[in-house]
């Protein structure tokens, strides 16, 4: 059975008037995923669950209605089909970031018309809740006024970016690097978040499926298929093109505000695995959502987080997890503009499996 591994770090940072001191500790927690070796926690996998009853696509029957891939065997075939391994050379560590050209950055800059910026990070959650098993910790020292932040950012609560060494499939990372070659106690020797040191500046597109359906939020477990994306393109008058960043709003934070937190790791709206080929065909360079991207249960028998695996490990796509897209959705609707300049710049920790980020959308 295919094995997937998740890697993560715990971050402690001390800020003072005289400088910044940081330390990065390898998480002591381990997860076992379908026979995987010990791994870290973002998003923290759950034991494989029985297949969920089939669910119809949001907009009725269509090419994705067959829900391919449906099981581990089909997933393995699909992984090979959509893989970008070797596309930018056998030593590549940037993945789909290669799709963001100078011309693409200029196009993104041209989208700034009114100069209004919207931050996409959700405020750190300091309480232990069903969707936040690793609360953000903040302590302050009196006198010289220094403080310490401690955050295990991978998971279902804190806004962060996943590096390309975060997930392995069958013992390999993106571009075919082996687990033995990449994983060390001091971080990843390949594909670490430092490869994103110059950040992302590109055209961002908000995919607002609740607005498409005329609801405030999608119910947990709702899958988003290719036909849903294309229906939104038609409604919004936009088309996803090479080098774009695609952000999926499911309304997770709106639902949380209305009904309270729930165990998102077991039941969340998100993309179905069948969207991976479309993402490759359109040349999407960065992907994210207001949750952990995958629909859960996954609708792929015996597999958890198949979209994460396909995006990071097959396509070489960095992922923005747990973004707060509520204000962005409101501003986009107000302006009737669903495209904007998106900038994302994680701290370039050498060997890091990711980092907390506050992505900025500018209209």
Label for each model-derived stretch:
Residues 30-363:
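Active-/binding-site microenvironments in catalytic and ligand-binding cores
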Residues 1-27:
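Sec-dependent N-terminal signal peptides
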């Amino acid at each position: 059975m295919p094995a997937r591994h998740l890697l993560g770090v715990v971050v402690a940072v001390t800020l003072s008037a005289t400088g910044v001191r940081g330390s990065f500790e390898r998480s002591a927690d381990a997860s076992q995923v379908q026979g995987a070796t010990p791994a870290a926690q973002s998003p923290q996998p759950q034991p494989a669950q029985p297949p969920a009853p089939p669910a119809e696509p949001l907009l009725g029957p269509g090419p994705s209605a067959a829900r391919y891939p449906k099981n581990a065997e089909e997933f393995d075939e699909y992984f090979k089909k959509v893989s970008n391994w070797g596309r930018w050379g056998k030593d590549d560590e940037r993945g789909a970031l290669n799709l963001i050209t100078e011309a693409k950055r200029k196009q993104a800059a041209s989208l700034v018309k009114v100069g209004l910026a919207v931050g996409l990070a959700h405020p750190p959650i300091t309480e232990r809740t069903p969707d936040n098993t690793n609360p953000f910790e903040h302590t302050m020292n009196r006198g010289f006024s220094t403080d310490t932040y401690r955050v295990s950012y991978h998971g279902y609560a804190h806004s962060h970016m996943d590096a390309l060494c975060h997930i392995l499939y069958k013992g390999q990372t993106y571009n075919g690097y082996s687990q033995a070659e990449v994983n060390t106690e001091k971080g990843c020797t390949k594909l670490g978040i430092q490869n994103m040191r110059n950040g992302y500046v590109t055209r961002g597109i908000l995919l607002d499926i609740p607005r498409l359906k005329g609801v405030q939020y999608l119910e947990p477990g709702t899958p988003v298929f290719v036909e849903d994306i294309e229906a939104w393109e038609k409604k919004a008058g936009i088309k996803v093109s090479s080098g774009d960043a695609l952000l999926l709003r499911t309304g997770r934070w709106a639902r949380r505000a209305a009904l309270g937190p729930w165990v998102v790791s077991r039941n969340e709206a998100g993309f179905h695995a069948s969207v991976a080929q479309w993402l490759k065909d359109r040349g999407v360079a960065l992907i994210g959502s207001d949750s952990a991207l995958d629909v859960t249960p996954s609708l792929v028998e015996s597999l958890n987080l198949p979209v994460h695996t396909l995006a990071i490990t097959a396509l070489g796509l960095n992922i923005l997890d747990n973004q707060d897209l509520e204000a962005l959705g409101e501003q986009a609707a107000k302006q009737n503009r669903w495209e904007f300049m998106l900038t994302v710049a994680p701290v370039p920790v050498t060997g890091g499996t990711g980092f907390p980020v506050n992505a900025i959308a500018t209209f």
